[in-house]
């Protein structure tokens, strides 16, 4: 494949950009009164309004041409068919198989993986049922009231985000806790709130060798044994999500309480697998099934719909437009419901670990920008924090505004206030406010001319700031499944366009390797040859703790 910037469709986009780059969205809406209806898509429980973007019909046509020149349709097919598209690790990428709701087989090297997928899912269902019904008892015959998931990265964030988002569907007796940081404080805070006789620990580590996870797991094990006294009781209070049976058994966990997943499931794409055990325990097997169903529906939409009606494809291509032509270095996720407060952080990992790459699949360095910085917060909080920069700052940062349509609980007025802010912010980003409009407004309020001249420039909004609005019918397991799968596929499409491998994460490894050496030095070993800064920092630590 040619470098992106040498493709004829990319060059056509460059020419088009020089024509359209300063065109204001006000003009686009004025020229097309149906723009808001035409630039609108629905798939299942999700609705996407992408009309408030700096695009025209010609822009979209050229972006679709780019997707075709990059053989996107064939690349989508290759992923779903189990081809080894993770070329640096020679692995298939089949998180989609985990939510396959059909009877069709999914093969890797001519072997159908669906029987194994269904077997692990059934095992998860049986175990979660035993906890939820109270038939699984702790070492003192108490029922389990607290579940602590110990993991990091993909073994933590996905399950954490879903459990927080869907807490209204949780079992009333169960309390779910997540521990990822190795600082000790997070684990200590959890252990102070739970009782050993009624707590279950899930240790989530594919290799059962992740330093941070095992440090926390062994600390939890030590805390538990301080009360339970006998190692045989570990079997009732610790389970593992892993592939390393021997290490799991050595820890004291019974092999039948180990839940398997596979190397064709990337960590950040793994909440649909046994890594989602915490989700199933907390929400129940029916709601977990609805989560999978929502993702499956988005998979079907992504695979079958033409690009012109394909939600992940359109979101991805619009993102390419901003990153590679407008030089937008970041993208913002702003959910307007507090239960989705972990969603920006989850997408941050999903996107930045997938597409934070500078080497093409052929081993050559890119000569264009790739993955953006992803950041965000819940919408109303964000309005009173960083929206100032979005409205009047010097950076162009596209934003996804996410909200649900369903009036919740006994406070419908709150929800209407919330949605009014969503729609108003998107309109304000698009329209802005001109100097003339500001001056006229100030004059109507009776301000003097000298005050108007002095203050008016500070109240001008340039507008033309892009946004997508994503509306969920309601926050439900199915809609959350679709929402996550939407972003998974968007990220995949962008990786295809940039010709990078979205499914490895070598950038995680270097710091971990260096940390092993430095850890031995901090513990008193001989300091190796580092740079002067690192040597100095190690010595500062040793001196501080020498007394």
Curated annotation (Swiss-Prot):
A GO BP annotation: glycolytic process
Localization of this protein: Cytoplasm
Presence of keyword Isomerase: yes
Keyword Isomerase: yes
Parts forming coiled coils: none
Residues forming the catalytic site: 353, 384, 512
Alphabetized Pfam families for the sequence: PGI
Gene Ontology CC terms: cytosol
GO molecular function: carbohydrate derivative binding; glucose-6-phosphate isomerase activity; monosaccharide binding
Gene3D superfamilies to which the protein is assigned, alphabetical: 1.10.1390.10, Glucose-6-phosphate isomerase like protein, domain 1
Alphabetic keyword roster: Cytoplasm, Gluconeogenesis, Glycolysis, Isomerase
Record family assignment: Belongs to the GPI family.
Listed PANTHER family: GLUCOSE-6-PHOSPHATE ISOMERASE (PTHR11469:SF1)
Protein name as catalogued: Glucose-6-phosphate isomerase
Lineage of the organism: Bacteria, Pseudomonadati, Campylobacterota, Epsilonproteobacteria, Campylobacterales
